[in-house]
Amino acid sequence: VIELRGSHQRFPSSKLPNDHDIAPGQSISNGLFEEGLMTNQTQTHQVTLDFYTLNDLRTIAKTLPRLELHPDVITKIEAGAQFVLEKAAEDRYIYGTNTGFGSLCETRVENEEMEMLQFNHVVSHAVGVGEIVPESLSRLMMFIKLLTFRTGHTGISMAPVQRLIDMWNNDIMPAIPKKGTVGASGDLAPLAHMALPLLGLGKVYYQGEIVESAGVLDAMGWEPLRLKPKEGLALTNGVQYINARGAQCLMRIEEMMKTADLFAAMSSQAFSTSETFYQAPYHETTFHPERKTVATNMRKVL
């Protein structure tokens, strides 16, 4: 008998708890896509410069901790914002900062008009249509957007970033229409709708209802933000709506895979099949980790 041992190396484990395998008695959905859930005020997650995996996003979506920024993240954001302010003051054309957009890229915008330029950019792109996406999708999209600000490369200042964190921590989620992305060129409309509440415009999910953001800002004692150079562009550029939808699709697929493993185990027991095919030694002959995962899941529930 020749004993074969695989040398397959799994990807490095996430810094957050693994939630892929089935545990006896574990709920399949475990509240992952439930709506109207509130932030866990007893648990805090510090947003760092580390890479976030799908498993990290899943854990955040399930546990809904309060958010705060690591000091290193704050330093990078502040440095990036200062860099943009310095460049905007120079006598040179900087796209979307002291110039118009698209075909107006060579039209200079004066210093006193830069704030209005960013405001108009956000408002003019908030033209999404269709039904409002679920609150869970809006929340995940907003978290992924926060991750894009960590390096300071967008040039956004701390005020909009902190406002998004405050909205998360107080269960205030942007109400975002379903249709409006232009794909790889950017989720312009969805992200613009995400940014509207920062300006006291648009609507939000709040206390189980969709309401005008202006009233919520008044209730929280928050003033509408005034965008600095490039901040409207930083808020609307990106594919975080697509990212969030894709992440949720993958999470749902993995939940379906868990269900399939349960059905396979139930069928095996119902038909009194041999136990050999899901025992660990049998799967040491393969380099496919997915086979091992399915076999492990079946053993856990049998």
Protein language model features and the residues they cover:
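Low-complexity, intrinsically disordered or signal/transmembrane-proximal segments
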Residues: H8-Q9, H20, Q26
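Short linear motifs in low-complexity or flexible loops
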Residues: S14, A23-P24
